[in-house]
């Protein structure tokens, strides 16, 4: 059966070669006589898998030596709840910049444990732009400043790293990590759920400057303590080994493809194809986001009549283009163009959009 182009926002498409390798190794892996999902996480075999995944991720993202890398169970929402526990002292404030749905989720999770303050909020303008960093209201003694690098639902993306002075900048990179070069030294911490650009759902990556791990934070169990997790190489308890293995295969694939420089080129080409179809449609398709902050990863757009949405989704599915229905919070159509989406997928979508407009415009 031919694989379709899957535009799902997450869990998202994975490289076919990675899936084929995982399929081939599922029953018996690496000559050990058992599946990768059956061997101990503390065995020499799996420890080698974990070490290779970290080494490859460090190479892919050019992670400085003074940053620790954690592989954690669960997703980004879990991390959002743990950030104040690990990095904010009791009674200390943390600043949040709200540029879409996931920024709102981040501050909601944090507010249970910290004085979570809104430094800037783009909701009044419909989340179509990102407030300039110079306009943010930052607390001088804030534990950190949190941003969402790319908003998957509203389709806005920070195209430059904001300057927050000496405050640690924390960022959710779940949907844009490894999509282009990133100067990690500008951040105190970045994190990402794997299920968009790094692998399958169920595992996340936290990259944190080591000196921040010395903060006392708030009383918490060892399992929620990032310093303890770093000391135990992300194996304080049994990790999601299958997910970790798949993440490692995906990261290695990205390196073999040419690394983040190559994916930046591909992602720019894919985004230009879809935005070109929107902007060249004479208003039949509409994207509401200011051009300077348009996401390259997630492109929401709207048709002239919402009654056409279901027809667009059904016809596109029949054409081998999957998961184009927009998020329920905003409606419309959404195309997610993560690293594993080939340029051919964006070409096919742009061609379908032109054909659909010719028939229904």
From Swiss-Prot:
It comes from the Bacteria. Its main location: cytoplasm. Pyridoxal 5'-phosphate binds at residues 76-77, 102, 152, 172, 195, 237-238. It is found in: Cytoplasm. Binds 1 pyridoxal phosphate per subunit. L-glutamate binds at residue 42. GO terms for biological process: L-serine biosynthetic process; pyridoxine biosynthetic process. GO terms for molecular function: O-phospho-L-serine:2-oxoglutarate aminotransferase activity; pyridoxal phosphate binding. The keyword Amino-acid biosynthesis applies. Its cofactor is pyridoxal 5'-phosphate. Belongs to the class-V pyridoxal-phosphate-dependent aminotransferase family. SerC subfamily. Homodimer. Catalyzes the reversible conversion of 3-phosphohydroxypyruvate to phosphoserine and of 3-hydroxy-2-oxo-4-phosphonooxybutanoate to phosphohydroxythreonine. This is Phosphoserine aminotransferase. The lineage of its organism: Bacteria, Pseudomonadati, Pseudomonadota, Gammaproteobacteria, Lysobacterales. The gene is serC.
């Amino acid at each position: 059966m031919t694989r379709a182009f899957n535009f799902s926002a997450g869990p998202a498409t994975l490289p076919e070669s990675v899936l084929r390798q995982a399929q081939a190794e599922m029953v018996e892996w690496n000559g050990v006589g058992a599946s990768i999902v059956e061997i101990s996480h503390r065995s020499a075999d799996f420890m080698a898998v974990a070490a290779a995944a970290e080494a490859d991720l460090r190479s892919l993202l050019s992670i400085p030596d003074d940053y620790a890398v954690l592989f954690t169970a669960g997703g980004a929402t879990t991390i959002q709840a743990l950030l104040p526990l690990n990095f904010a002292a009791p009674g200390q404030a943390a600043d949040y910049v709200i540029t879409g749905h996931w920024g709102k989720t981040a501050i909601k999770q944090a507010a249970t444990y910290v004085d979570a303050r809104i430094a800037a909020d783009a909701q009044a303008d419909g989340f179509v732009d990102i407030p300039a960093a110079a306009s943010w209201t930052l607390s001088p003694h804030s534990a950190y400043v949190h941003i969402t690098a790319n908003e998957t639902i509203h389709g806005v993306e920070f195209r430059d790293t904001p300057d927050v002075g000496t405050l640690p900048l924390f960022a959710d990179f779940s949907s844009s990590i490894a999509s282009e070069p990133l100067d990690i030294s500008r951040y105190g911490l970045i994190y990402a759920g794997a299920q968009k650009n790094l692998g399958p759902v169920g595992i996340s990556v936290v990259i944190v400057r080591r000196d921040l791990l010395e903060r006392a934070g708030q009383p918490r169990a060892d399992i929620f303590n990032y310093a303890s997790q770093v000391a135990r190489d992300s194996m304080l308890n049994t990790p999601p080994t299958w997910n970790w293995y798949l993440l490692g295969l995906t990261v290695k694939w990205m390196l073999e493809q040419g690394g983040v420089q190559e994916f930046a080129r591909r992602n720019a080409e894919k985004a230009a194809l879809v935005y070109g179809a929107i902007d060249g449609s004479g208003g039949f398709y509409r994207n509401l986001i200011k051009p300077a902050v348009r996401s390259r990863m997630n492109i929401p757009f709207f048709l002239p009549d919402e009654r056409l949405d279901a027809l667009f989704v059904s016809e596109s599915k029949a054409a081998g283009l999957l998961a184009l229905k927009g998020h329920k919070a905003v409606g419309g159509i959404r195309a997610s163009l993560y690293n594993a989406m080939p340029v051919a997928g964006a070409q096919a979508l742009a061609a379908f959009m032109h054909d659909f407009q010719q028939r229904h415009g």
